[in-house]
């Protein structure tokens, strides 16, 4: 009985203490409302004692009869003593930052001396996250030169459309381009009195030549496939005299991993179809159709210190050809060694090549070629380069290489003689060039230097010196012994951009045929006329305003005693052009 009373008293005492402790916690919660602690307990986390209990059926309350329960919070304002001491220094002045937006389009136009004109428009618009479409248009013109008997103005027009599609696996770039180059055969001999030549009637001569090129390209590139690239392009060329030429080229690249190496295959197909209205001497139509199949087979190793490629090139010639054989084999070796302790690497390249020539290719190099050519492929049995190159972290790169090549049928631009029975055609006035093929050996040096100061400031210069030696012709016509190309880009104060490029062409020999008044001498050996070296220089200065407008100034000049790439075709000198550029967005 006594034990029962003791247990009852202990139970009542524990119950009393628990009750007062609960009241004390509630008071503490009301007094300290600013500090709340929330404990998140995962739902339906049974303990061992609840596992075997019978769960009661859930009861859904009647929302029509039960009143909504509203939660009210009582906010108690508590005075706070601030300990913040303000800084006595003067406040910083906010400076407005210049906005640098990227635009997808721009339009430029300019005008300068010698009747210069320039119109330039370009736009690249994103259709969606994978596709982009672009358009580019440019037109430039130059007026007549002084003291020229025949017209000498020229202009250039180009319009192209581009479509780009890219994903994580591949990239497709397709383009459609039309460009037209309008020139004149005005390069008459300057040491003749043309008024005393009866067969020369300038009032009846039309020196015009229009070279029109229509080009379609489609380039496919895969990132994670054995087929790396597929390229297709076709070119249709039509000139002022209704001569036509069609080029088709298809090539691909396949790379197969084999152990620690790669097996690389590059099949290629080239096709040339040329139709000339009239030949130079016989005045009869001249046509040529040639196809070339090519397969490059090589093994590639890309190592940490040593990279090498070795294999073979196979060519098979089809169609109209005067070559001795239709099948050609050439070795191909590329080797590069870079030690781990140095940034200097040594490289060796040795291979051969076989190329189809075309009126399209020649006219882009020399627009004053005769509008009828004898086309032959160029056979290069071997060519090699041996040298060193270096790349520093500071942005400096350079290379030095010794070069040698032998060509069995190298194309040379040789000046044609004056034709007495010229039919008032300007290209018969000793103003045009034919293409002759000769064996040519070239031995020399190549150097290159590139300095990248940062993203917008860089300077590069490349030099090539060779000693061309021909075998059948008395000189390697119009091949300079030294060529120097340089380019520089600089930005100042984030507003001023300077672009400069130039080219130095050394001395070279040109064929010179004396003019005979009453007889044709097609087979007479020409004299050698040495052309002086000259330097072509072009510079563009652009000032970008805070708005979308920019002002630019262009300067072009030639330096030398006889500043012309081709004999008696004096280039324009001291050209100035001032223009505006406006950037904007095109949104669909």
Place the predicted regions along the sequence by residue:
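N-terminal periplasmic/intermembrane-space "pro-region" immediately following the signal or transit peptide
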Residues: 6, 21-97
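Outer-membrane beta-barrel translocator/receptor signature
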Residues: 87-89, 98-147, 151-157
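Short loop/turn motifs that connect adjacent beta-strands in outer-membrane beta-barrel proteins
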Residues: 95-102, 127-130, 166-172, 222-230, ...
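Exposed, low-structure sequence patches enriched in small/polar residues
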Residues: 102, 107-110, 305-588
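Membrane-embedded beta-strands of outer-membrane beta-barrel proteins
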Residues: 121, 159-161, 216-220, 250-254, ...
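Surface-exposed extracellular loop regions of Gram-negative outer-membrane beta-barrel proteins
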Residues: 125-147, 264-268, 272, 287-319, ...
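Flexible loop and strand-edge segments within Gram-negative outer membrane beta-barrel domains
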Residues: 142-154, 158, 173-231, 235-247
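Outer-membrane beta-barrel transmembrane domain signature of Gram-negative proteins
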Residues: 201-219, 233-304
């Amino acid at each position: 009985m006594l034990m029962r009373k003791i247990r009852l008293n202990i139970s009542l005492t524990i119950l009393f203490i628990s009750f007062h402790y609960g009241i004390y916690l509630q008071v503490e919660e009301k007094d300290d409302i600013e500090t709340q602690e929330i404990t998140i307990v995962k739902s339906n986390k049974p303990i061992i004692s609840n596992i075997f209990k019978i769960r009661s059926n859930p009861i859904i309350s009647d929302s029509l009869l039960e009143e909504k329960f509203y939660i009210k919070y009582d906010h108690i304002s508590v005075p706070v003593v601030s300990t913040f001491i303000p800084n006595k220094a003067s406040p910083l002045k906010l400076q407005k930052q210049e906005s640098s937006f990227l635009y997808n389009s721009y339009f430029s136009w300019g005008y300068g001396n010698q009747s210069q004109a320039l119109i330039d428009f370009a736009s690249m618009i994103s259709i969606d996250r994978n596709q982009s479409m672009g358009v580019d248009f440019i037109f430039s013109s130059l007026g007549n030169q002084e003291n020229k008997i025949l017209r000498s103005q020229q202009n250039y027009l180009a319009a192209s459309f581009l479509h780009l599609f890219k994903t994580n696996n591949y990239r497709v770039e397709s383009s459609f381009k039309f460009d037209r180059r309008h020139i004149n055969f005005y390069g008459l001999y300057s040491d003749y009195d043309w008024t005393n030549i009866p067969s020369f009637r300038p009032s009846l001569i039309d020196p015009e030549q229009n070279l029109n090129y229509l080009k379609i390209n489609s380039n496919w590139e895969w990132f994670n496939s054995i087929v790396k690239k597929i390229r297709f392009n076709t070119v249709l060329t039509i000139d002022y005299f209704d001569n036509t030429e069609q080029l088709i080229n298809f090539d691909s690249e396949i790379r197969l991993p084999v152990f620690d190496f790669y097996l690389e295959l590059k099949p290629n197909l080239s096709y040339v179809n040329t139709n000339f209205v009239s030949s130079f001497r016989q005045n009869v139509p001249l046509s040529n159709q040639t196809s070339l199949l090519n397969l490059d087979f090589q093994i590639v190793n890309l190592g940490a210190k040593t990279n090498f490629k070795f294999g073979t090139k196979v060519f098979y010639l089809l169609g109209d050809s005067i070559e001795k054989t239709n099948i050609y084999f050439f070795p191909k070796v590329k080797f590069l060694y870079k030690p781990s302790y140095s940034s200097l690497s040594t490289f060796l390249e040795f291979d051969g090549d076989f190329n189809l020539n075309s009126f399209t290719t020649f006219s882009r190099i020399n627009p004053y070629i005769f509008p009828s050519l004898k086309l032959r492929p160029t056979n290069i049995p071997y060519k090699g380069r041996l040298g060193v190159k270096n790349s520093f972290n500071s942005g400096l790169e350079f290379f030095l290489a010794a070069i040698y090549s032998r060509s069995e049928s190298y194309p040379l631009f040789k000046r044609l003689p004056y034709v007495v029975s010229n039919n008032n055609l300007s290209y018969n006035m000793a103003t045009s060039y034919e293409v002759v093929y000769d064996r040519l050996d070239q031995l020399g040096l190549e150097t290159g230097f590139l300095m990248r100061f940062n993203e917008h400031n860089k300077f590069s210069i490349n030099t090539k010196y060779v000693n061309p030696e021909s075998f059948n012709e008395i000189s390697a016509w119009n091949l300079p012994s030294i060529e120097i190309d340089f380019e520089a880009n600089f930005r100042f104060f984030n507003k001023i951009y300077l672009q400069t490029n130039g080219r130095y062409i050394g001395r070279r020999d040109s064929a010179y045929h004396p003019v005979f008044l009453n007889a044709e001498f097609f087979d007479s050996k020409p004299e050698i006329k040495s052309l002086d070296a000259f330097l072509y220089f072009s510079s563009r200065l652009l000032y970008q305003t805070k708005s979308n407008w920019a002002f630019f100034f262009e300067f072009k000049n030639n330096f030398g005693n006889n500043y012309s790439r081709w004999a008696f075709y004096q280039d324009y000198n001291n050209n100035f052009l001032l223009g505006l550029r406006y950037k904007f967005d095109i949104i669909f």
